[in-house]
Amino acid sequence: VNLKLKISAVLLVSAMVAAPAFAQGSGASDYSAKCAMCHGADGLSNSPAGKALGAKSLKDPAVVKATDAALTATIKNGKGKMPAFSGKLSDAQIKGVLAYVRALQKK
């Protein structure tokens, strides 16, 4: 019985550690599919489309300081030339993209 309990505990901890990594992984693929064309793979908005549209760098201090709620609203509703993604990404996908953006900002 002790062995079963230890195995269960290890599996539970493994699942808890893997869940955020999976969310970031799916956020990365959604970012690549929907955001990188303008904001670039690195978030600096140095892509041709990003430069042409004047896309804001995701590492801009104003973007870094923005709350998660504000950035979620921007992703959902669009802003300026950025299109809205509320009908194109689920809330879970938007949350994953935001987590990925926050990770990019730390690089």
Residue ranges and their predicted role:
Residues 1-24, 100-107:
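Post-cleavage N-terminal segment of exported redox proteins
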Residues 12, 51-54, 73, 97:
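Short, glycine/charged-enriched secondary-structure capping and boundary segments
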Residues 15-32, 46, 64, 70:
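Electrostatic cytochrome c docking/interface patches
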Residues 25-54, 79-83, 103-107:
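Periplasmic/extracellular electron-transfer cofactor-ligation site
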Residues 56-69, 85-94:
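Electron-transfer interface patches adjacent to heme c in soluble/periplasmic c-type cytochromes
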Residues 64-80:
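Short Fe-S-cluster ligation motifs
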Residues 74-75, 86-107:
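C-terminal capping alpha-helices of c-type cytochrome domains
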